[in-house]
Amino acid sequence: MKVLGIFHKPSLKSVAEKFSEILFDENFHVEYVGSEIPSIEVDLTLVLGGDGTFLKAAHKVRNPLVGFKGGRLGFLSSYTLGDFDKFLEDLKNENFERDIRYFLKAGDFYTLNEVLLIRDPVQKMVDIQIFFQDGDFYFHADGLIISTPTGSTGYSLSLGGPIMLPNVNSFVITPVAPQFLASRSIIVPDDEEIIVRIDQEINLILDGMDFGKVREVNLKKSRRRIVILRPKDYNFSKSIKEKLGYGKRFL
């Protein structure tokens, strides 16, 4: 890989420029450095920022991505900003594993983390019905979130949803503030086509982006995917222990 791009959140401009200088000195060509992604083909995009910045990049590029944590948690990042020397060695030696993540298609749109269907603050609770191959489920709630394994450590987790390993071929469906205590998350295989119908229009939010109001949405796994480059010593279990304290031995 010789041609690189660097996409960064605005506050990390000086760090991105420093990375670019180092890469140039190491005979790598950096095609662009910026907080916007131009229509230029590169071999690898470096993403400096948090998971939100990484998601923006994932929606705009088709080449492999490698993230540098410049936010709070950075589940999608492979390195910290202080790990650049290690990244440079891995880049020279092509010492990477490919971590493939698939998008979820919601109607005509795509999402990497989750689909959030949520009422307005002054709107009454909604009736939601979910249809899939084996039947249907009903919820009376403020909304619904359908998460990919990638998104399972995000908003879905804060609603009580499970953590899914990245290679699990499933989605998790979790109601938002349901009326009934028994309304819990359900995991469905990702080869299912899911239809969600609501009794009134509510907001459709994909990866934090507002796509207007809907009363029905069809969901299915997309063939569209991204490739995240990870160092060969990357370990997802270690990552969630460090970032969330999950499964960590305290005594």
Curated annotation (Swiss-Prot):
<dbReference type="GO" id="GO:0003951">
    <property type="term" value="F:NAD+ kinase activity"/>
</dbReference>
<feature type="binding site">
    <location>
        <position position="177"/>
    </location>
    <ligand>
        <name>NAD(+)</name>
    </ligand>
</feature>
<dbReference type="GO" id="GO:0006741">
    <property type="term" value="P:NADP biosynthetic process"/>
</dbReference>
<feature type="binding site">
    <location>
        <position position="124"/>
    </location>
    <ligand>
        <name>NAD(+)</name>
    </ligand>
</feature>
<dbReference type="GO" id="GO:0019674">
    <property type="term" value="P:NAD metabolic process"/>
</dbReference>
<dbReference type="InterPro" id="IPR002504">
    <property type="entry name" value="NADK"/>
</dbReference>
<feature type="binding site">
    <location>
        <begin position="113"/>
        <end position="114"/>
    </location>
    <ligand>
        <name>NAD(+)</name>
    </ligand>
</feature>
<dbReference type="Pfam" id="PF20143">
    <property type="entry name" value="NAD_kinase_C"/>
</dbReference>
<comment type="similarity">
    <text>Belongs to the NAD kinase family.</text>
</comment>
<keyword id="KW-0067">ATP-binding</keyword>
<keyword id="KW-0521">NADP</keyword>
<keyword id="KW-0520">NAD</keyword>
<keyword id="KW-0808">Transferase</keyword>
<keyword id="KW-0418">Kinase</keyword>
<dbReference type="Pfam" id="PF01513">
    <property type="entry name" value="NAD_kinase"/>
</dbReference>
<dbReference type="GO" id="GO:0051287">
    <property type="term" value="F:NAD binding"/>
</dbReference>
<dbReference type="InterPro" id="IPR017437">
    <property type="entry name" value="ATP-NAD_kinase_PpnK-typ_C"/>
</dbReference>
<feature type="binding site">
    <location>
        <begin position="153"/>
        <end position="158"/>
    </location>
    <ligand>
        <name>NAD(+)</name>
    </ligand>
</feature>
<dbReference type="GO" id="GO:0005524">
    <property type="term" value="F:ATP binding"/>
</dbReference>
<feature type="binding site">
    <location>
        <position position="56"/>
    </location>
    <ligand>
        <name>NAD(+)</name>
    </ligand>
</feature>
<protein>
    <recommendedName>
        <fullName>NAD kinase</fullName>
        <ecNumber>2.7.1.23</ecNumber>
    </recommendedName>
</protein>
<dbReference type="InterPro" id="IPR017438">
    <property type="entry name" value="ATP-NAD_kinase_N"/>
</dbReference>
<dbReference type="InterPro" id="IPR016064">
    <property type="entry name" value="NAD/diacylglycerol_kinase_sf"/>
</dbReference>
<feature type="binding site">
    <location>
        <position position="140"/>
    </location>
    <ligand>
        <name>NAD(+)</name>
    </ligand>
</feature>
<keyword id="KW-0963">Cytoplasm</keyword>
<dbReference type="GO" id="GO:0046872">
    <property type="term" value="F:metal ion binding"/>
</dbReference>
<feature type="binding site">
    <location>
        <begin position="51"/>
        <end position="52"/>
    </location>
    <ligand>
        <name>NAD(+)</name>
    </ligand>
</feature>
<dbReference type="GO" id="GO:0005737">
    <property type="term" value="C:cytoplasm"/>
</dbReference>
<feature type="binding site">
    <location>
        <position position="142"/>
    </location>
    <ligand>
        <name>NAD(+)</name>
    </ligand>
</feature>
<comment type="function">
    <text>Involved in the regulation of the intracellular balance of NAD and NADP, and is a key enzyme in the biosynthesis of NADP. Catalyzes specifically the phosphorylation on 2'-hydroxyl of the adenosine moiety of NAD to yield NADP.</text>
</comment>
<feature type="active site" description="Proton acceptor">
    <location>
        <position position="51"/>
    </location>
</feature>
<keyword id="KW-0547">Nucleotide-binding</keyword>
